[in-house]
Structure formats: C-alpha cells, structure tokens
Amino acid sequence: MAARRQSDVSAYAEFVAARSASMFRTAYLVIGDYQLAEDLLQESLVKVYVAWPRLQDVAKAEAYTRRIIVTTAISWRRRRSFHERATDELPETAVPDPTERVTGRDKLWSELHRLPPRQRAAVVLRFCEDMSEAQTADLMDCSVGTVKRQVSIALGKMRERLGADFVPPAPDASVVTP
C-alpha cells in the first residue's frame, strides 16, 4: 500500500476535527446508545480514512460518512449478538418503580428505539437531522418513495403505541445526553 500524502492526512484530520461532533449526534440518534455511538463513529471514521484518497469530491465527505454510519448501524442491528445487553439487575428480580413517571421525551425515545433499523434511520435523518427526503434517500441508498414509506410506517407505529393523548415534547437543542 502506498504511503498517504500529507495533504490527504491533513484534510482528513481537519474534517474529523470540524465535523465529528455532528457525526456523533447522528450516530447516537441512529444507534441509541452513547458508548455504541462512539464505537459506531470510530468505525465509520476508520472506513472514511481508508477511502479518503479515493474520494473524488472531499466536499461530499460528510454525506459519505453519514451514509457509512447509517449502513454500519443497520448491519450491526442485524447481528444476533447486538441485542444481548449486560444488566445490573436480573430480570426476575427487577421491579419497576410505580412512582417513577416517564417523561414525554423518554416515551418518544423509547418508541423510536423500538423501530426497525431502516425505519429508525429514516426518521432520524428526516426529523432529527432535518434532511430532505432526497438527501435521506441518497444516504440510505434507496428511492425517495422508499424513504416516504419507511417514515410513514414508522410514524404510524409510534402514534399507535403512544396513543392519541400523547403530546410530544417541545423541540430541544440538547437531544444528545450522555
């Protein structure tokens, strides 16, 4: 493998420094777990670094990285081992606290987390990342119609599960919390 040009390494380092916080937000919203989002971002940035010399237009590196984040997250969620989680409490002894109230944001987040990977990615990209249907379709490597269908089905499921009396929380700039 040929040595990387210093200009490629510098351009990549500048890209990571400037855009990694935004990319982390996308990774967190897509995968739903802070530590897994860090791993997802790291793995995605490694893939971008490997492909960096082949990128025709470095200005499209962010879109390319988001696409890698989404496809890698979908791939991870398909693995059987992804759904295995360590817990501090055994399921048979865990008793939910009846006095604990669930906030609207927690309910919304929970329902978003229950969606299948492609539906979740479509909702996150459309509404959390505020991307157009065309941009979302491009990142997900599908048609605009597929994005519309995935979003429609996902929102229908969420409405059904949350009920008619659910009032969504006001938009908040601090969506990502560790």
Residue ranges: model-predicted function:
Residues 2-3, 11, 138, 156-178:
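C-terminal edge and immediately downstream basic/flexible tail or linker adjoining helix-turn-helix-like DNA-binding
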Residues 53-56, 67-88, 100-101:
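Arg/Lys-rich amphipathic alpha helix in sigma70-family domain 2
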Residues 2-3, 10, 14, 80, ...:
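Acidic, proline/glycine-rich intrinsically disordered inter-domain spacer in sigma factors
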Residues 5, 43-60, 79-81:
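Sigma70-family region 2
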Residues 39-46, 59-71:
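Structural recognition of an alpha-helix C-terminal capping motif at a helix-to-coil junction
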Residues 122-126:
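A short pre-motif secondary-structure segment
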Residues 4, 113, 117, 129-149, ...:
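Helix-turn-helix DNA-binding module
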Residues 1-25, 35-38:
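A short, charge-rich alpha-helical start-of-domain segment used by transcription regulators
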